[in-house]
């Protein structure tokens, strides 16, 4: 939200809220947050590291953490609960743009579009063979809001659909969309495209590792738009180098920004993006508003008039 916060200053002023706007490149580290300890009552944050140590020194003044977006794995929820800090997020925030990013990656790999573009610009005239999505099986790991949206869209392309989740998925959705729920090993062994759409928690940390990658078919492509640590990155690099899978599309990484020396940067069969699959000004605007709403609720301020308050016009 930082690039747009000035647009919403009139709304914060309406509620007599003073703003502290730190300089942030990607996220605030534990040490950087400690510098603001005791100086704020609430925060709208991204993936800033609200550890137990940070929360302990920020309370009792800190009352609410409003996460801009969905994932709250960077917040120590147990410590927040113990210290009386409410935590809010914006579920279903970026379902559509993330789902469309997954479909874009699948189409790019299936139709070999980036590789033909590179060849043409290098002066070559090479007809690289492609496949259609209707020939392929998609396996979605994490059939939540984003996972469901990916499956619905993939169904329109005639793909065979597999799902895996640790919670039971409504039978109506599965029947309506022709999704077969199965075990993770079976999904990995059968899928041509594997889309990771699960949240990061103790059950999903390094879910994709050397052992699970050994189950993947050599022609498969791994797509991760969820959280970087869901994948054991060194194990993925090794698997790609060994030809255990044919490619990967990665929007998230174990360390962000991705280090310049990462082997992933030089792999021709890997597509990379800087944690940007949520990119959509339309959906950003909804998340801005909902993040402010969660902040106000945590500060026990009235929200009835929030929707009537206007931010400054968005630059064209």
Map each language-model feature to its residues.
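Short acidic/histidine-rich motifs immediately flanking catalytic phosphotransfer sites
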Residues: 35-42, 59-62, 189-194, 217-220
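C-terminal helix-to-coil terminal segments
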Residues: 8, 14, 81, 88-101, ...
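Rossmann-like adenosine-cofactor binding region
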Residues: 51-52, 168-263
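Phosphate-binding beta-alpha-beta segment of Rossmann-like dinucleotide-binding domains, i.e.
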Residues: 83, 90-137, 149-152, 156, ...
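Conserved beta-strand positions in the Rossmann-like core of class I SAM-dependent methyltransferases
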Residues: 20, 162, 229
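N-terminal glycine-/charge-rich "phosphate-binding" loop or analogous flexible N-terminal tail
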Residues: 1-40, 314-316
């Amino acid at each position: 939200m930082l690039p747009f916060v000035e647009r919403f200053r009139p709304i914060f002023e309406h509620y007599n809220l003073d703003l502290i706007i730190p300089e942030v490149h990607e996220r605030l580290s534990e040490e950087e947050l400690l510098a603001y300890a005791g100086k704020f009552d609430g925060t709208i944050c991204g993936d800033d590291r609200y550890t137990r140590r940070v929360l302990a020194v920020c309370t009792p003044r800190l009352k609410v953490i409003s996460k801009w977006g969905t994932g709250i794995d960077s917040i120590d929820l147990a410590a927040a609960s113990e210290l009386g800090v409410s935590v809010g997020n914006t579920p279903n925030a970026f379902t559509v743009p993330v789902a469309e990013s997954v479909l874009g990656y699948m189409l790019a790999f299936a139709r070999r579009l980036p590789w033909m573009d590179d060849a043409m610009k290098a002066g070559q005239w090479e007809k690289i063979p492609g496949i259609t999505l209707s020939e392929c099986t998609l396996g979605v790991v994490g059939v939540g809001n984003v996972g469901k949206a990916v499956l619905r869209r993939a169904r329109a392309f005639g793909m065979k659909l597999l799902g895996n989740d640790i919670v039971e998925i409504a039978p109506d959705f599965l029947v309506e969309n022709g999704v077969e729920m199965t075990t993770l090993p079976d999904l990995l062994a059968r899928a041509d495209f594997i889309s990771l759409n699960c949240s990061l928690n103790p059950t999903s940390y390094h879910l994709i590792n050397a052992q699970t990658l050994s189950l993947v078919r050599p022609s498969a492509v791994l797509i991760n738009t969820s959280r970087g640590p869901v994948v054991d990155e060194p194990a993925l690099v090794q698997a790609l180098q060994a030809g255990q899978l044919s490619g990967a599309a990665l929007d998230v990484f174990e360390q962000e920004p991705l280090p310049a020396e990462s082997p992933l940067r030089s792999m021709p069969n890997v597509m990379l993006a800087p944690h940007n699959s949520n990119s959509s000004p339309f959906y950003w605007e909804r998340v801005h508003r909902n993040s402010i709403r969660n902040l106000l609720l945590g500060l026990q301020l009235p929200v009835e008039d929030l929707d009537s308050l206007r931010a400054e016009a968005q630059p064209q």
